[in-house]
Structures are given as structure tokens and as C-alpha cells.
Amino acid sequence: MAVTQTAQACDLVIFGAKGDLARRKLLPSLYQLEKAGQLNPDTRIIGVGRADWDKAAYTKVVREALETFMKETIDEGLWDTLSARLDFCNLDVNDTAAFSRLGAMLDQKNRITINYFAMPPSTFGAICKGLGEAKLNAKPARVVMEKPLGTSLATSQEINDQVGEYFEECQVYRIDHYLGKETVLNLLALRFANSLFVNNWDNRTIDHVEITVAEEVGIEGRWGYFDKAGQMRDMIQNHLLQILCMIAMSPPSDLSADSIRDEKVKVLKSLRRIDRSNVREKTVRGQYTAGFAQGKKVPGYLEEEGANKSSNTETFVAIRVDIDNWRWAGVPFYLRTGKRLPTKCSEVVVYFKTPELNLFKESWQDLPQNKLTIRLQPDEGVDIQVLNKVPGLDHKHNLQITKLDLSYSETFNQTHLADAYERLLLETMRGIQALFVRRDEVEEAWKWVDSITEAWAMDNDAPKPYQAGTWGPVASVAMITRDGRSWNEFE
């Protein structure tokens, strides 16, 4: 079936219909797509779960989720349209025969079936088997899966093999929700539509790059999941490496899904290996202790409800990443991410090299670097720090740091920036895979991450403590300071 830019008529089947992901993210995003007129008039939304619900009961659950997790008041006209799309199928995913009930509800002739797995990856194999046995897996049916998939290369391959037994790669949409953020999408335009950056985006002009994804919250009651994953698997493998790829990739031949993803895979294959020989030099792992966050006292990681008091799981990671290719040789990428940090923010800062000759020593003995800051959240936008002459009659060139600032909300008069899930759901309905992660991307990322986590395990060093509400262990500052650089300060 040909791909179009219009959302096709779909049966969107949400496995895990009463779970957190569905209630917090998917349902509010579907409401916003309805509001924007982006849903095909014939699209239906079918919740799947073990609950003994009918259409009316599920409709009530959806309404409650929207009232709880949306910041705006529900428009009753929109609600009437959205609620008319809803239905529910009572189904245990481990009961393969029960999938025939789902099949009876679907309209495979006139609608594309999109199976959204809003459930743990351990269930994906059973779901795919049920769909396959019920003959619900033929093209153009699609499956949507949340990253991270597995906790290592081996477990990721196992999950992908289970899915691949019933669905071809062109049917599989692996979500990394950071790829749906407007500011991440803008990286392609910023880099490849502007000659200012197209011609100045390599080791000739760039000194280093910093990528920070900071969270104010702790583990939010997710001890069971997080303690097995840790910040490395949960955030570095899952989100920060994708951002790094978008910053470091070479220009694709076009904007097709495979052209973009081919270039990202090249970056991942060029990442210099970190193993036991250099892991202490290149990485810092930390774990938050009791402190103050969001204006209140909070417990340390080992004091959280359900905690294993001897856990060595990291809640903070800082890494120096080197890319061994012609474009980036000699340009370090510094990544850091953690929980219980002072603020919630995600940003990329690109530092440009200073001029070879300083003509303004009377004003600045050492010229500061120009830097491009890409604010992914909050206050989405881009700013460039430059030096300008201070106006005046003084014969000296008094220079001052100023910023050229593009704020998305102000520049584009946007009161509502589409949530990442709105974009990704819509792209799934359109059949466009450019914002989704291909299997080889996932596996190359896991290869690189596995060598680090294996080195940590062999060293058996405890993560370095940092107080909740601070910017991580002192060692993370020392790591970048050794290179004569410093982390960007948040305003």
C-alpha cells in the first residue's frame, strides 16, 4: 500500500489499555489529534485488556484519563466525536485462541490495523503469536513498540526475533519519544537547510558538544523496573544516543526513513569503544542520596519504597564519547543524565572553536567560545551566544556576550506545541517510519552500551553519591575539567 501524508483509516488497537502509558500519553494525544482534525473520520480506537469492560465502561475510563492528565478542559463536541471511535476487547494476551475475538472486531479490508504494545516487552512475544495465529499480522498491519527493548543486546535480539517471526521490519515502529519532539525534529532543518551550519558542522569549527537530559523526579514508584535498568539503559541507550546521532550524522541523501536511519547507524558504528581499560576515565556513575528537590525533602535512592539497600544501580551517568570518523575525530561529546537533579531540562550545547587570532585582547584576553544551545525542553527553542561591540563613543572595542534567541512559543505564536506522542501516533497512521528506530540502530546502540555496563560490573565499584537537588557527583565535573572544559550552566 502506498504511503501518503494523510492519516489513513485505522483500527488503533491499544494493548494495555488501562496502563499508565495509555492513560497519561496515548489518550491525551489522541484527543489533541482529534482537536487538530488529524484523525481519519473512519479511524477507530480499540482498547485491549483483561478488564471485564464493554464499550461504555471503557469510554468512562478514557474520559477519566483525559480529565486527569490533560491540562485543558474537555470540549464536549470533540469528546462526542472521539468517544464514538472507542471500543473494547476483553483479552488475555497469553490466551492465543482469544485473539479471534479481536479479529472479529477488526475491519482489515477497509482499515489498517495498528497494534500499539503499551505493555512490558516480556509480553510482546505472546501478543505477536496471538496476532499471527489469528492471521492479524499481514501487511499493511503495523506494530508499535516502546524502547528500551530489553536490557542488553542479547535480550533485545530475543524480543526483536519474537516480533520478527510474525512481522516484517517495514511493519515495525519502535518508538523513542524524544524523536517526536519538535526541537529534535528541527535538528534536521537547522543542520541541513542552513548554510551557516551545513558548512560549519565538523571538527574544523566545533570544539565539543554537550548533551544534558536532567530530571527533577526520582524513580516515581518504579523501583522494580528501574533497579534492573539503571540510568544507562533507561536514558543513555534509549534517548541520549538518538540525540547524539541526530547531531553527529552526515547529511542523508534524502529525507526518507532509511536514508536518515542509515546515517544514524554509521554514527553508532563509529563510537569509540569504552571498556574496562578506559571506563573509569570516560564515565562517571552516581546514585542520589537524601536531599531537597522541588522545594521539599526527598529520600535517597536506597531509601525509596521497596528499595534494595545494597543496590549499586546508577541514577546518574556522565560519559565522554569519541566518534572515530573524519567529521568528528578530536571532538568529544559529553553526555550527562540523572534523576533528582536541580531542574527538569533537556538541551544540546554546541561549542565552536575560538578564532586563531584574537584582535580584541584589550577587551577579552581569551575570547569565549560561540555556542549554539538547542533547548529540547522546557521553553523549546534555539539560541546562539555571540560577542558584540557595546554601543558608545569609546575608541576601544568593548565586547559583550549577547544571545540571538529563537523561542518556539514566541516566534511561531504557538500556545500548544504538539506532544511527541501526537506526532509519533500520526506518523504511524501515515505509514512513515523516519522518526522510528530500525532494528540495526537498536542493536548497535546496545553493543556500545553493553561494553560499558560489563566493565562496570567487572570493576564492581559502587556509584558515587550525590545529594538530591545537585548536579550529580563531583567526579562528573572533574571528568570534563580534565579536558579543560566545563558543563554548561543552566539559567
From Swiss-Prot:
MF GO annotations: glucose-6-phosphate dehydrogenase activity; identical protein binding; NADP binding
Keywords, ordered alphabetically: Carbohydrate metabolism, Glucose metabolism, NADP, Oxidoreductase, Quorum sensing
Pathway it works in: Carbohydrate degradation; pentose phosphate pathway; D-ribulose 5-phosphate from D-glucose 6-phosphate (oxidative stage): step 1/3
SUPFAM superfamilies tied to this protein: Glyceraldehyde-3-phosphate dehydrogenase-like, C-terminal domain, NAD(P)-binding Rossmann-fold domains
Cellular-component GO terms for this entry: cytosol
Modifications the protein undergoes after translation, according to the UniProt entry: Probably processed by the ClpPX protease to generate the extracellular death factor (EDF). It is thought that processing produces Asn-Asn-Trp-Asp-Asn which is amidated to generate Asn-Asn-Trp-Asn-Asn.
Consequence of gene loss (knockout): Loss of production of extracellular death factor.
Active site: 239
Statement: the UniProt record of this protein carries the keyword Nucleus: no
Binding site for NADP(+): 50, 92-93, 147
Binding site for substrate: 177, 181, 215, 234, 339, 344
InterPro entries assigned to the protein according to its UniProt record, in alphabetical order: G6P_DH, G6P_DH_AS, G6P_DH_C, G6P_DH_NAD-bd, NAD(P)-bd_dom_sf
UniProt catalytic activity: D-glucose 6-phosphate + NADP(+) = 6-phospho-D-glucono-1,5-lactone + NADPH + H(+)
A Pfam family this chain is assigned to: G6PD_N
GO biological process: glucose metabolic process; pentose-phosphate shunt; pentose-phosphate shunt, oxidative branch; quorum sensing
This enzyme's EC code(s): 1.1.1.49
Class of enzymatic activity (EC top level): oxidoreductase
Biological function: Catalyzes the oxidation of glucose 6-phosphate to 6-phosphogluconolactone. Probable source of extracellular death factor (EDF, sequence Asn-Asn-Trp-Asn-Asn, NNWNN) following processing and amidation. This pentapeptide stimulates cell death mediated by MazF. Artificial peptides with altered sequence show that NNGNN, GNWNG and NWN no longer stimulate MazF's endoribonuclease activity; other peptides (NNGN, GNWMM, NNWNG, NNNWNNN) retain MazF-stimulating activity. NNWNN, NNGN, GNWMM and NNWNG prevent cognate antitoxin MazE from inhibiting MazF; although NNNWNNN stimulates MazF it does not do so in the presence of MazE.
Family classification: Belongs to the glucose-6-phosphate dehydrogenase family.
Assembly mode: EDF binds to MazF; mutated EDF (sequence NNGNN) does not. In pull-down experiments interacts with CedA.
UniProt protein name: Glucose-6-phosphate 1-dehydrogenase
